[in-house]
């Protein structure tokens, strides 16, 4: 966060400040003492006691010893310390020891030179790692910075015995960090922990997703109460890895420190998501006249962005980058015609003076591209820049009835277009809308969670200077959204830094108005010169101040309503959430020269004589034409405005205001120019011009005074200015009516000059002044400069107006012109004013002296009420601020004659504030008299402080308002109150240093800054690795505000003592820790500090140790957490309960409640990556209100879960979705899976899924109570998950067998095996084949049914894994599935049963077996269903009772929510509706992602998996969790991916929602539509069949050819559309109801999704969730998986372990670009990087689109596809060959059981045939020799793209 305000220290001072302590100082003064003296103002958090701590150890007892350096073979301890060798130091175990190298006397001087000379260069270089530096100690030369700290541990006895002379030894890594060498002499001393406690610690991490609760737990576990050092590697739970980057003690970087309870950890992500916005405003095309002459955009493309990308590369950061060009285009009425030929939606009419319609444009250049490919990013950016201005200038006329497709307006192709409009200036751009759009997707951050990136940072690059004109609604909405989401915004300005506080938002707050709105008020606001940018020379027409230039972004209010809802005064605010930087290419050009050791490069940061003359930044066109700046020789002395001091109020007692006492000098305008023209251009407000009736009134009188009189008058004035406060207070008491008084000229304290006279007077009166006068704040008003802040914007409230509401319109008869802009340099010593035109510093005060109303006393002097507001100049040089003083109370009752409304000019008066930094704070209860202001004054009295007293208990408030009343009245405004927590109102021209150092200045981010940052430099640390929202904050309202402005909602939570609870916390302490963790992961911060201690009356909260949960668990312990407008208080009460009180700000819920709908709709024109033109989008910009049900969430954490029907959606669980895509097996895979070489690829794919189910079953979470129940079971193995495999799509299965099935059958939750009574359990030694055959085929035997696989129907068969489970459950002497498989093979050898194709042994899997004919029992009917018949006597063994939270181990089976248990052979009766059956296509189980128990809590997720699967399609997995560690989930997924990959399955993360809905959550993305040039003919009628019959029924498939095309291009089915299922069936999944509008397919690479619309178009969407970043972790996942795989796959058929090989690259497995047609490169290994991964979807799409646009190829494809026999397959087919072309061929088993799989590129042989129906298994064997793709393999061969 930038340090706001005029903190204009020299660049030398800014850079070298941290090295002050390395300066050479006298021996009597330690370097640390010098540091404390110089940097005490930076220690924001230190108490006075802490500031006085001596950091040096000079007074401690030291011992000199020899330091050894050892390696890990000597000892694994980092530091070995022989306690016995230092008995004289009385060292105890647990003491903190300091190691300092023995320095020579000249070291300190040498360190000064080396540090000052190289500090800046090494600053960023060191951050990339100390290993890159030749001298890592270059920045840490002082004892404080370079000392090595450690905690004493006992020395191992064996080392002590072997090396008795060892005193202290460190490892090589520690020695390298601290610069120690072996056998060097060091000083050893014991230090106090308080002296070495770190204030902040920067911790960096990458390639992992960490929630803030994990960061909190990491600190508690690995850092709290320990010594840390720079570069230290942190490993938490063996998986989460981080590195200590920087350690700060009192604002200084050190090499080591103690992590105390009050140390603030700052986590920084080196793998974040960056959204770069480049504001393409009008100035982007302006030339840099003072620099290189390039346009400003060149600074972006050739300067800033390459520098940013290089720093990313140097730090090895791995970010994802999205770049968006945005602008606001203004259209003139002349170009559009009258009336406007546009619909009301197409353009927005902003209530600017000339009613200019605008439209916002966004051009997405790249989306989520890896930062390492920055050359590609810059190339794309250059291409888009060439056409950007042309594209946004073409306005296409829309009609109101423009059709919309997928929520986007699609206009006809031949709509008319005109060239109109021009980009607005940066000041009036759409920056807030852009930021709001970028942060909108964070509202859905819990869905489709990226598991390798943490944090989102927005960088806005603007050509402006950091000043923006916005509307109150957009500022409030954006601020609220950003406060809730905890996102960081960086603003990078290309223009030089202005002379005022930045970043600055100016807005007009809505006010309550009674009666009708008058358009006359609109004109009273006057001109707004700050709207005119100095570099926009093309526009010289005057502009009126807009009521709000951006409120038009929220259509819904008419223009008249806009006018009536705005006040006429500007408010100025600085947001907490914006960090500003200024890019100066010259600075970094010199730095590069220094880095390259250019001999001509300047010595860094040394004071050199300024070689070029001062160049003024004033860019007033009129002044330039007068030649004043070139030829004026007059001088002026301006006193310093002391830094950090406010401008005090002064009283002009005794100073006459009669015309005789004023200088009546008059200067003429240029004779050949019109007076009105000269004043009209940003010099005078419009009301002033309208009030001029006589041109002579504008002319200024010549001076009639002698120089001596002028000097005497100035001396008299100075006496009044610098008199003591005591006299002023008396004068204030005597003054009653308020009068405007004389003007002042003040300059920013960055460019200060002080005359000798002023210095003497200043010192004299500073010593004599009192420290009192708290009753009047500093008041300043905007100065007028050329492109800067406007002249005062409205009349002062009249005597009769209410002090709490500004009078928006003064009586026109009494109005006088506000101010003359004619200025004179004629001061002392130069005689009379020169007769030519004057333009510099003399100010006409005709508007400062107002005409008093009748009946009012006419004082001659008024009290000076000044407030300076800074220039909005876009340049970086000084400009003089003209301040109009408004009299608050007259000092004397002398009447002031009123001779004319035009008053003469007055010489410049200059005041200097006394040293009263915080003594003039205004009390809250101050009142304002009704006669405060004169009716006729047109100058605005600015009320409020220039800074905030940090001790006040009224919370953040507006210190700067522009209403006529007091500050208190403005604070009470509900609008200002609502905005105050996020945007701080200030006086931007003279912001006090005390205000700038206020800790609450940075809002929620205050703890992210170890020391106050500077505005003028680029915040590279934030730009390189954004900080995560700190865990703690000190922002808290006062007790009064908490009671009056917040709604309270209390409730209590207690742990669930139900023994059947799932992962339920058993104690209150564990529950409290989980509740705090849940809030931290949702963006809350723990509140500490004095504000919460004072508000709650609990002093202990000020020093709360947030890393000690034991102290938080005691009775009465209180924890406050805050987020935005919400505060939670957790109190541990008696009885083991936790009382939660939610405080919700009243204003946030009530402000604009009725208007929010009107303002929410935003309609920009957006062009995504592949779009050819801009399209209008309707986007809601509502801030996401806190609608989270914390009561439900806390009770869910506590174990009370029966009341939630869908907790994943109700409580916003984190959710991710994966698919297993079938891939062709490579030769290497075949070699490593020798035991399965007789299987075809389809069977191996099913084996892979079966392997995963075994892992899931083994690691499913079982509550302790259920574990005890299962331990009573003698069986040692669990059942595999019952997944039904089909060769048809789910919709076809449901439609064909609806009369027999109900997929939510409880029997499907577990194995269908029937348990025999205990007395009837069998034994292998006492069973005969005939009796076993009878039992198997009996009622309690294995399930027999007719099963179809592809085209072949197998009668009366059972499945291998069901029979394995039956054997395990019914044989007393079989204890594992391996034994059951072995016994099954024995039975098969004896002829009990056989494989249906006689080609497999018995296996535990989806293999079909039939009882041999000699043992077969005649059956009355065959159970011809794929699904089980219900039996009331069925007893099912327990698998995972936790699959349903309400299941109990006692039941023995899981209950279904939708269907009751039915009698046998009865049809299913739906429970919800008599006409609709409910079918559940997936199931959920609780899965333990921490089987090794590395975490201190249960780590459980909900695992959803398909229960019905077609091997040709994707297998779906969805994970959801609430409070689980994401890194453990990622490790688990890696292990699954490594396992699946060995079986030809690729695990890919895909979006949960369908592709066409991406724009709802990600506004910068949109599906790409591809249409067929030649419409396809009607498709053939599909073959519909059930278990026993075939029939051709139904209508033709209108998407038959579309699906065939997708099969051709290697797409597999992901999800079917909801309309594909029968209308009378209610289909649902365990994660929710499917709501896909269109069927969705996914490319085998996983990188591209496609949907088929109802119109027959294709919608393509790149899958950006695919990441090659996971590849690096595959090897670890393989090791992790190897430890946990089931025993029955360990070297069954070979001694070679197929899982011991190194797994190839994890998903995605994308082809190289030169071989985009094949799923895998010919070498069988993936050879693609993230750049190719990013481009792969575009290349696939390009080839597909070319095919769709080739009419000849389409016609040929239609004819070939139609000639084939009709297949029932809706999913992807395995090959382009017809199924009927495969002949029948029986081969010996020796031939079938081949060992070598054919190469992928040799599988194109074609064999003719015409048999319509054939055994699929036989065809698979044929494929083994003919190299044809298997019909079951799901397009397993690469397809020809032609």
Curated annotation (Swiss-Prot):
Residues 797-814 have a biased composition (Low complexity). SMART domains: DEP. GO terms for biological process: intracellular signal transduction; negative regulation of TORC1 signaling; positive regulation of autophagy. Transmembrane segments: none annotated. Its main location: membrane. One of its GO terms (molecular function) is GTPase activator activity. It comes from the Eukaryota. This is Vacuolar membrane-associated protein iml1. It comes from Neosartorya fischeri (strain ATCC 1020 / DSM 3700 / CBS 544.65 / FGSC A1164 / JCM 1740 / NRRL 181 / WB 181).
